[in-house]
């Protein structure tokens, strides 16, 4: 299937590892011109080499810290300058923040800033460019709403879900769609750091109908489709990629 992505441009945040890295490679394989950002510039350089080796075009690399207050405006400006325009925005930068109820305000504020505020600010900074050429795709990598404990990032991601739904009412008339992909247990540096192989096997057997953790590429294919012109009628929705982990039916 031709996804009609060749010649499109995309900005992918959190592209240095895991899901963001797989999304960047998936878009590049479809002929998308990339701007990639993350804190670790060395990992972005490695990503660029992998994309070129696979036959893709070297991405524009913009190492930045999404927690920095001025990053959204600077990143939007520099990404548009590098690629000419931004057709696709993938907000993947973020971090899980499990905490106790007594956690200090600064921990909450950091989690909310990274997982909600910066996503909103960057999106709003990119939107005028999308509106100017009457086309855009925004995909937010979020998280589950089915809570199993207190996690500051869950609250932030729930905010993303509500915000994007409202935003579709404002900007979809300009050919822009906004969707979210909440991951399940997807293999990453963080997963390997937090859960042993035994823990992963036990959790998979008990909680994931598919019986295993997912791979970043299995989520990336969904994002690549949502980024395409073919997904123009998919708008304002959440599409979990979790192997059946979520227990709710709708």
Positions of PLM-derived features:
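Short C-terminal tail/terminal secondary-structure segment
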Residues: 224, 235-250
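Conserved NAD(P)H cofactor-binding loop of Rossmann-fold oxidoreductase domains
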Residues: 92-97, 142, 244
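Conserved mid-core segment of classical short-chain dehydrogenase/reductases
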Residues: 73, 81, 95-110, 149-152, ...
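Alpha-helical segment proximal to the catalytic Tyr-Lys
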Residues: 128, 169-173, 232
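Catalytic loop of short-chain dehydrogenase/reductase
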Residues: 137-173, 185-186
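Conserved glycine-rich cofactor-binding loop
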Residues: 16-17
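A glycine/serine/threonine-rich, flexible loop-to-helix segment
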Residues: 1, 49, 173, 185-208, ...
């Amino acid at each position: 299937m031709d996804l009609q992505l060749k010649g499109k441009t995309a900005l992918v945040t959190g592209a240095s590892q895991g899901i963001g890295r797989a999304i960047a490679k998936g878009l590049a394989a479809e002929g998308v011109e990339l701007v990639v950002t993350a804190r670790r510039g060395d990992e972005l350089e490695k990503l660029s080499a992998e994309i070129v080796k696979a036959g893709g075009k070297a991405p524009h690399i913009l190492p930045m810290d999404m927690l920095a207050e001025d990053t959204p405006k600077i990143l939007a400006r520099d990404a548009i300058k590098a690629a000419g325009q931004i057709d696709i925005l993938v907000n993947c930068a973020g971090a899980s923040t499990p905490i106790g109820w007594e956690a200090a305000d600064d921990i909450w504020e950091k989690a909310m800033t990274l997982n909600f505020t910066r996503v909103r600010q960057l999106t709003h900074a990119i939107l005028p460019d999308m509106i100017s050429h009457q086309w855009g795709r925004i995909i937010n990598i979020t998280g589950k709403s089915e809570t199993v404990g207190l996690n500051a990032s869950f609250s932030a991601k729930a905010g993303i879900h509500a915000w994007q739904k409202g935003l579709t009412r404002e900007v979809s008339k300009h050919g822009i769609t906004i969707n979210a992909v909440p991951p399940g247990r997807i293999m990453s540096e963080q997963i390997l750091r937090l859960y042993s192989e035994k823990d992963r096997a036990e959790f998979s057997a008990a909680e994931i109908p598919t019986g295993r953790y997912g791979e970043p590429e299995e989520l990336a294919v969904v994002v690549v489709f949502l980024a395409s012109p073919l997904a123009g009628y998919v708008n304002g929705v959440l599409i979990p990629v979790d192997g059946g982990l979520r227990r709710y039916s709708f």
